[in-house]
Amino acid sequence: MTHEEILAMLGDYVDYLIANSSAEAPMWNIEKVRSGKPNKWNYIDGCMITACLSLYKTTGDEKYLRFSKNFIDWFVQEDGSIKTYDPKEYNLDNVNQGKNLFTLYDIFGDEKYRKAIETIRSQLATQPRTKEGNFWHKDIYPWQVWLDGTYMAQPFYMEYETRFNKMQGCIDSYKQFMNIKKHMRDEKTGLYYHGYDESRQMYWADPVTGCSPN
């Protein structure tokens, strides 16, 4: 199979996904669809809409932009509230989808996206933290730092701080990354452990390092 044939096949697959997906029933999260449970604002959709917006930027094909906008608009209300999203859950996973709001705001200039950005930023303003200052991964996971939580929250955090807050939170973000390096990096391999429990109370936490087994 040639490079061109592979690209064509991938393009057909993506087109099939978006043609058969909606915010209420995204085909890429088929387990959720089959469960019969209503879809919620979540990080999986965030990853896929980021991919669709990247395809729009790369190809210029409006179908990717239309799909992304329609998907996000199902959740984002005119007042900036986000259907099914509660900032007080303090779940870093839910921040990930917020990255797409910056792109849609840049393209369309609709203030509801700007307001929704503030809605998500309000979560980080009061997100519980470890004693050293890192965001808890979730309120239901106290004192825990997870690598994927860093991916979920920090890009949005830095985008916001750079655009709208005169970079005031950049040092805070840097310190959080340095704490991760300090506690979660294996000096022998250079690889990182997935989780860290500052309290050492979780069953998986090493009693000395606080890190997960892997």
Positions of PLM-derived features:
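Extracytoplasmic mature domains of secreted/periplasmic and thylakoid-lumen proteins
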Residues: 80, 87, 92-152
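Well-ordered alpha-helical scaffold segments within catalytic/enzyme domains
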Residues: 1-2, 46-61, 96-110, 154-166
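Alpha-helical scaffold segments in carbohydrate-active enzymes
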Residues: 12, 16, 54, 74-77, ...
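Solvent-exposed loop and edge beta-strand segments that line ligand/cofactor-binding
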Residues: 2-6, 17-47, 76-96, 137-150, ...
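Broad hydrophobic/π-residue packing in well-ordered secondary structure
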Residues: 43, 47, 64, 96, ...
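Low-complexity, Ser/Thr/Pro/Gly-enriched N-terminal "stalk/linker" regions
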Residues: 1-76, 111-119, 123, 127, ...
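Extended ligand-binding clefts on enzyme/binding-domain cores
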Residues: 147-214
